[in-house]
Amino acid sequence: MNDSEFIQLADQLYQKIEEKIEESGADVDYDQNGSLLTLEFENHTKLIINRQQPLHQVWLATLENGHHYDYNNGKWIDDRSGDEFLTFLSAAIFKQSKETVDFTE
């Protein structure tokens, strides 16, 4: 994958995250600033999602750990655990905020 393909895929991911948060009605604020997408919750905790263009990865920072995701077969997959990004993100949102956001189609 080249840089422009990576940026397009990451932008699509960010757009899906924002759309699904809106559709869910969850009390989750989000702000995109360049390659950084921040999700903030009522309890003032945050999840930080960041595009790492040189590595063609999307990174997710939670209260507990950092996760690195590679695009593989149409999904973003954690390079250590094998977890799928949107499934993990949904669980991380619930764990930090008790809000439910369903990222499935």
From Swiss-Prot:
The membrane spanning regions, by residue number, are: none
Q: Does the keyword Transferase apply?
A: no
Query: Per UniProt, what is one Pfam family of this protein?
Result: Frataxin_Cyay
GO CC, one annotated term = cytosol
**Keyword Metal-binding, does the record have it?**
yes
Q: Which GO terms describe its molecular function?
A: ferric iron binding; ferrous iron binding
Show the SMART domains listed in the entry: Frataxin_Cyay
UniProt keyword list: Iron, Metal-binding
Q: Which GO terms describe its biological process?
A: iron-sulfur cluster assembly
Q: List the disulfide bonds.
A: none
Q: Report which superkingdom the organism of origin falls in.
A: Bacteria
The UniProt similarity line reads: Belongs to the frataxin family.
Function statement: Involved in iron-sulfur (Fe-S) cluster assembly. May act as a regulator of Fe-S biogenesis.
Q: What is this protein called?
A: Iron-sulfur cluster assembly protein CyaY
Q: Which organism is it from?
A: Psychromonas ingrahamii (strain DSM 17664 / CCUG 51855 / 37)
Native organism taxonomy: Bacteria, Pseudomonadati, Pseudomonadota, Gammaproteobacteria, Alteromonadales
